[in-house]
Structure formats: structure tokens, C-alpha cells
Design a protein with these regions (language model features):
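Second-shell loop/turn segments in exported
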Residues: 1-3, 39-41, 66-74, 95-102, ...
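Extracytoplasmic/secreted envelope proteins and their assembly/folding machinery
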Residues: 4-15, 84, 88, 105, ...
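Solvent-exposed loop/turn segments at secondary-structure junctions
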Residues: 33, 57-61, 88-90, 96-99
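Active-site recognition of the HExxH zinc-binding catalytic motif
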Residues: 53, 70-96, 105, 109, ...
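Long, well-structured alpha-helical subdomains associated
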Residues: 118-180
Length: 180
């Protein structure tokens, strides 16, 4: 399920994988930020280094659906990938790259896929919790790229309109090493 525990574990896992010097803070609910953030259920504010999660909206996106419901397959990783993308944006911010243009949106999708590849490996977490992606989880992330595109948005919520472009960026992240 997509809840505070799983989102907390997700952010802990990303911290173990990337060990940022300044890990982003995680909050639930709207956060004050000096830039407009769009309507994504998870956003990143560079000035406060904070990832804000609208948990009810994220949980709805993460509710399992399948072809029997005449819907694209979606599930927890549809929601998790959105949070991962905002964590990647935090890492991008710490590297000093531009966050508010289409290039940033596509770079974020690419980096999200790289993170997803790392999340398919087992990792020991200080809390003792665990989270490891499986092959079917990638389908759920791709479904999100097709239906809402939140993973491929810039810091201000502006995305890339073409779903195939979003998927190409994500695919590049799956097929390249971590140094890009």
C-alpha cells in the first residue's frame, strides 16, 4: 500500500542508495515554497530542500488497476516513481543544475529510471524495513508516464507533453550506467 510507512521506507532506501550530503526532508501535505509546483501529488521545493507528499492523492494513484478495469496497469510503483522523481530532483538541485525547463523534466525521468534499477537490488536499511522492486513494478512506472507524466516534470510542475518522449527518457535511464 501507499502510506506513510511505505513512503518513509522509500525515502530511506533512496538515502541509502545515494547518500546525499543534504538529504531532502519529507513532509505530508502542502508545503510553502517560493515557486509554483503544479498539481503533482509529490513536489520538491529547492529553497527548503523538501519533498511534499499529498498522501491521499498519491495513494489513489497507487491503487492497483488492470486491464480488467479497462485501465492501464497501475499500482504502488506508479505512486512511488513520482516520489522517486522528486528525490532525484533534490539530487539535481544539489548539483546546481537547472530545474525549471523541459530538459530538467526529461533528465528527472531518466534519473528516476536509474534509481528504479538500483531499487531492484536488495539493500539493508537502518530501520530494518525493506523495499525492493520487481519486474512488474516497471510496468507500473511506465503506466504513470503514459497517463499522468508526473515523473517527467520540472520543479514547477511543467511537463513534457509527448508520452513517448517521457518514456524514451525513462528508458535511457534504465539502459545507462549511473554516471549517465
Amino acid at each position: 500500500p501507499v502510506d506513510k510507512d511505505t513512503i518513509g521506507t522509500l525515502v530511506e532506501l533512496l538515502g541509502v542508495i545515494y547518500s546525499p550530503k543534504q538529504p531532502p526532508k519529507l513532509t505530508y501535505g502542502p508545503a510553502k515554497c517560493d515557486i509554483s509546483q503544479g498539481d503533482s501529488p509529490a513536489s520538491y521545493c529547492p529553497s527548503t530542500n523538501t519533498i511534499s507528499v499529498n498522501l491521499p492523492a498519491l495513494a489513489q494513484i497507487g491503487t492497483p488497476a488492470d486491464m480488467a478495469e479497462k485501465s492501464l496497469i497501475q499500482g504502488d510503483n506508479t505512486a512511488f516513481s513520482i516520489v522517486v522523481s522528486r528525490y532525484m530532483m533534490a539530487l539535481e538541485s544539489q548539483r546546481g543544475v537547472k530545474l525549471d525547463d523541459p530538459t530538467a523534466a526529461l533528465r528527472t525521468a531518466c534519473l528516476t529510471a536509474q534509481a528504479q534499477r538500483q531499487m531492484a537490488k536488495p539493500h539493508d536499511l537502518p530501520s530494518g524495513a525493506s523495499l525492493q522492486l520487481t519486474a512488474g513494478d516497471l510496468d507500473k512506472a511506465v503506466a504513470g508516464l503514459l497517463t499522468n507524466g508526473y515523473v517527467a516534470t520540472a520543479v514547477d510542475g511543467q511537463g513534457v507533453p509527448a508520452a513517448f518522449t517521457r518514456i524514451a527518457a525513462f528508458r535511457a535511464g534504465l539502459s545507462t550506467d549511473d554516471e549517465g
